[in-house]
Amino acid sequence: APNELKLIEWGVLNLVQSYTGNKKDDAEFLKSISPIQYLTPNYPPVLISGGNKDFLTRTQSLPFVKALKNQEIPVTEVFYPDSKEFLVHEYQFMMSKKASQQTFAKTIQFIQKYSPAFF
């Protein structure tokens, strides 16, 4: 599994490089595309989830949650830091995993709470 993590991180970095056009990290560009830069009091409620083996959880998702809370924007966090399951990026679609099923249920609850017109 650790080799899978390195492969996933490599893929994500290549994806970012495809958008930035650089072979190195362009911190200013990456900062400019972060949703953190665009938070306002009118920002809608957010549901955010990340896997315990997804490096974007610690580098993007958790800082985003902190910024949302600082702005008092409603945020529903779905993280499993102590899970024994190997939860990679997009674990939410691996429905054989217990965490995925729980996240799906929390997603439905979030939609029911903030978008009641759908139900």
Task: Go through each PLM region and give its residues.
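Alpha/beta-hydrolase superfamily serine-hydrolase fold, recognizing
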Residues: 1-119
